[in-house]
Design a protein with these regions (language model features):
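N-terminal, active-site-proximal structural segment of metallo-dependent hydrolase catalytic domains
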Residues: 1-85, 98-100, 253-277
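Beta-strand-turn-beta hairpins that frame and shape the catalytic cleft
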Residues: 3-14, 22-25, 111-116, 129-148, ...
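Surface-exposed cleft-lining segments at the edges of enzyme active sites
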Residues: 34-40, 66-69, 119-123, 147-155
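Active site of divalent-metal-dependent phosphoester/diester hydrolases
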Residues: 70-75, 89-109, 128, 182-246
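Charged helix-capping and loop-helix junction motifs
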Residues: 75-80, 160-166
Length: 277
């Protein structure tokens, strides 16, 4: 009799706060180069090309602080640009904070697997403009739920958001939560999140910020106990003020997803979108 379960699948994950394509080399850059957050600069497009080459090696990518097309990005939707360059067919962005024509602050999903459902949620907080993308692969009790988010800077706001997240995922068996959570692995709010949402932190203390001399972990990929983590690392690419965090997981046997092979980036020639100066 043929085996109905071909075995557990591997899934390559990446979470990256890309700071709208701007690199930062020291703390003083936040002040002296703050103008770059308002206007288009050629270095942003160069950085995006470098970021896209990183993304090409993964099956599911969660992005934070990506611009969905505004003045500062030269009216380039960075999500679609990165997806085209890295060969992702399934793309979705969630704009949470729009400042006129200047910026469209967004979370984003890039996936090689077709989602069965995508839901946008607004996160609670004293200051509006935070959200979470909920992406479902499969159906029923054995569906995989992937959450992409960028949490608040303040502890009080984060605790409110954690309560929301715990209520959101409490009935799910297989969860991957990724993003810039703005808190360390040993923080009170992380302990509350792991306990209330029944998630695991596979690599506590994996420093991702600041990218030029990382000394704290603000970026995380958390998983349900049903998901086996095989490898996790912070990648040493300084295209942002955060480092990307990469993880390879093995899914439970009952969860079978149509995961295609990644395209060969060496044969891909991206269309470089024009940059308004």
């Amino acid at each position: 009799m043929a085996d109905d379960h071909p075995g557990p699948q591997q899934l390559r994950l990446l979470s990256y706060n890309i700071q709208s394509g701007l690199s930062t080399n020291k703390y003083s850059d936040y002040l002296t180069l703050s103008w770059k957050h308002l206007v288009p600069v050629p270095s942003r497009m160069t950085n995006l090309d470098g970021i896209a080459r990183i993304l090409a090696d993964y099956d599911l990518v969660g992005l934070q602080e990506v611009d969905a097309g505004s003045l500062r990005s030269g009216f380039v939707n960075q999500v679609k640009y990165l997806a085209d360059y890295a060969g992702f067919e399934h793309v979705f962005d969630q704009t949470n904070r729009k400042i006129g024509m200047i910026s469209q602050h967004s979370n984003a999903l890039l996936s090689r697997i077709c989602p069965d459902a995508i839901t946008e949620h607004k996160l609670p907080g004293l200051i509006p403009g935070r959200g979470v993308l909920e992406v479902r692969f499969g159906s029923g009790a054995d569906a995989l739920h992937v959450l992409i988010l960028h949490m608040a800077l303040g502890r009080r706001g984060r605790l409110r958001q954690i309560e929301f997240l715990a209520n959101l995922v409490c009935d799910y068996r297989h969860v991957i939560l990724m993003g810039d959570l703005n808190c360390r692995s040993d923080s009170r709010e992380m302990a509350v999140l792991l306990a209330s949402a029944r998630l695991c932190e596979p690599a506590p203390g994996l420093h991702t910020f600041p990218s030029w001399e990382p000394d704290r972990q603000l970026d995380h990929i958390l998983v349900s106990p049903s998901i086996t983590v095989e490898q996790v690392e912070a990648l040493g690419h300084v295209y942002s003020d955060h480092l990307p965090i990469a993880m390879q997981v093995r899914l439970p046997e009952e969860l079978q997803l149509p995961i295609p092979e990644a395209p060969d980036p060496s044969i891909r020639t991206p269309d470089h979108w024009s940059l308004t100066m």
